[in-house]
Amino acid sequence: MKIAIEAQRIFRKEKHGMDYVALETIREIQKIDRQNEYFILVSPGEDRCLQESDNMHIVQIDYPSYPLWEQIGLPSTLKKIQPDLLHCTGNTAPLWCHTPLILTLHDIIFLEPKQGKNQSVYQKLGRCYRRFVVPRILNKCRKIITVSNFEREHICKFLHWEPKKITTCLLYTSPSPRDPTTSR
């Protein structure tokens, strides 16, 4: 099976929680699955924290912004690769994509009433983008994964969904990069 994994931001130097979830998930898949063929779809970045292997290929997609990368670059690349499945790891996905989709929905804070006013323009635009995209892709997903039972219950309650539509997968178990008592 050919599986594409969207991991747009894993090569950026300053990673966020979702980036670590994607990175560690991919590293674990790389250790245990030698049968399927994987295409890790990334943006260019300084931190080459993942290496290719026999069945795992890194595909760099170069677009100037997150929305253009996801809505134009990613679907264009998928047409070339022709994967059997796409896993989008960071809450959003292409609006027009014919590849069967699995989505990791970490939280839905962007759908809730905004708290505070100290957001940068970048954060405000990102929030608007997610508020537009996420409701439009959820029904297209073959499976939705979230990272805790608490968030699963919250998503189901907020969106009035049946719990069976969402799977909890405790993905990230690596030591915190800020924790001096642990080592890799």
Language model features with spans:
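Carbohydrate transferase catalytic cores enriched for Leloir-type hexosyltransferases
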Residues: 1-174
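Single conserved hydrophobic/aromatic residue that forms the stacking wall/gate
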Residues: 172-184
